[in-house]
Amino acid sequence: MEKSKNIWSLILTEIKKELSEEEFYVWFENLCFLESIGDNIKISTPNLFHKNQIEKRFTKKIKEILIKNGYNNIVIVFTNQPPKTHSNKQETKNPALNETFSKFDKLKEKTTSKEAIQNIQDRIKMYIKKEEEEPTNFKNPFLKKRYTFENFIIGPNNKLAYNASLSISKNPGKKYNPCLIYGGVGLGKTHLLQSIGNKTEELHHNLKILYVTAENFLNEFVESIKTHETKKFKKKYRYLDMLLIDDIHDLQKKEGIQEELFHTFNALYEDNKQLVFTCDRSPSELTNFTDRLKSRFTRGLNVDISKPNFELRAAIVEKKAEEDGINVPKNILNLVAQKVTTNVRDLEAAVTKLKAYIDLDNIEIDIEIVEKIIKEIIIYEKETTNEPNNKINIENIKKILLRELKITHKDIEGHSKKPEITKARHIYAYLLRNFTELSTVEIGKIIGGKTHSTVLYSINKIDRDRNNDKEINNLITELMNKIKKN
């Protein structure tokens, strides 16, 4: 115990050399040695806010001091647990406030500078005020632990979104801020968004992270207006370190909540706090959304998730079957992957139905049963989406593109470097990616033998241009509408 106290005294001595008198008294005067357990030395702080600030500001420096003096295995653990000799007597309703301001008696004895004392007093009042305003006992009830990066299956359709999400978790607020992940229903947007929250919580224990659906965000806002607690609503969302909002498209046509989101966005963004959103379409395709809010979404990274190709669908089906303990021939699973082309959710639903047949009916799965299950899922999908039942024909896409842009087959499949022809190829690649399940390699073969990277560049370029160029956005929207109608 005595050795641990000496180590803590050493740390204080070294820290004091590098801080001004005022800073040292603000952060270290009220710390108290609590106990030592093995290599852990526990230090008591006056309150939770003080604990968080000490960890944030000085953990790295303390570690350097320990290593420098040969205490490589020693870990300093800060806690707001009071010392064992701590009196429960409270001078006011806020004991933390009493403890914090008691430091001024000592400070006054050691300095004659009234200005220095006043400066510190003002700063501490500000910290205490912030502590009282910030939400305490922060909980994140909507994060589901089952969503992780480890059980997310990666393929060419979602790799960029996956890598960006993982990077955000490791360094929130640094890169890709804000980030908007967009794509159709059941493709894994929620899985990635929840994984960001879970991984960030695992790596950064002190951060306040909140996942919420756009619908719940709206409902909370409406309720706060009804109960005259809008101030409480603002505090909840503007003191976060990371805000994750799912299905942002649900806020279309709702001007009041868009206004609130705009101000919440600004408050967090200007304080380098991480924002991540999901949407069923790119920002340029959002309707009844204020331009200034849409412009905020495009400040950072916009990344899409498209429908999975066969290889990824097969991997998803196999993993789901393994998780559910289903032992069926691989050709059965491949048939599911081949026929269910809509999204991840439908693939998993098909495997769940297979399990039900096995567990409840105790029958052997054959091709006939699989085809029956697939038929049920495909019919349900057609009834519950606005997508056309017939697959959009590649030739129809090309026909409409050539007609509207007034170019020829030779132009689109050739090697002309004319700007208008190059632009047409970019658009063709973008349309094929959005209306078909073709991979970038397959699209490249259709457009005159272009490489994967060339096709990917074309798709990303049009996506960026739609955000920045109104004329291009209008052209693409018009082409897409004509293709859908055709």
Curated annotation (Swiss-Prot):
It comes from Borreliella burgdorferi (strain ATCC 35210 / DSM 4680 / CIP 102532 / B31). Domain I is involved in oligomerization and binding regulators, domain II is flexibile and of varying length in different bacteria, domain III forms the AAA+ region, while domain IV binds dsDNA. ATP binds at residues 186, 188-190. This is Chromosomal replication initiator protein DnaA. PROSITE patterns: DNAA. Residues 142-358 are annotated as: Domain III, AAA+ region. SMART domains: AAA, Bac_DnaA_C. Residues 79-141 are annotated as: Domain II. GO terms for molecular function: ATP binding; ATP hydrolysis activity; DNA replication origin binding; lipid binding.
